[in-house]
Amino acid sequence: MSSSQEPSTATHPVRRFKDAGYVEVASTLAELRQRIDALDTRIVGLLAERAACVRDATRFKRDAFQVAAPARQAEVFEKVRALAAHHEDDFPGLPDVVEATYRTLVAGFIAGEDRLFQQTEPIEWPCPSCPRP
């Protein structure tokens, strides 16, 4: 049976997992949504920190190919899939969700880094105040 109503956030669960080992995270949907909102706040903060690192990495790139860094992208996607696989018992298919999320995330960061790259200029050598590459 399908419902066209959003679930009540104050009531108790209306379904249970068949897995006897399942451990609930909260007793109401409202509590779960509060936890999710808090996690979203932390995630956005971490994304902002990642963005600062991506911006700084722009200084080390010579051209658009290096900005895109396809080998690094493949490395990141493989790494996050492996990390997510450790948690797949909690959420089946998590590696697929994480990889899809990271593919979107990385595409957005590369687009931003490409725009930032256009705002840089090559360092002329010798530069007395600059360390050698």
Question: Across the structure, where does each feature detected by a protein language model lie?
Answer:
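Domain-level signature for soluble enzymes in the chorismate/prephenate branch of the shikimate pathway
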Residues: S2-P133
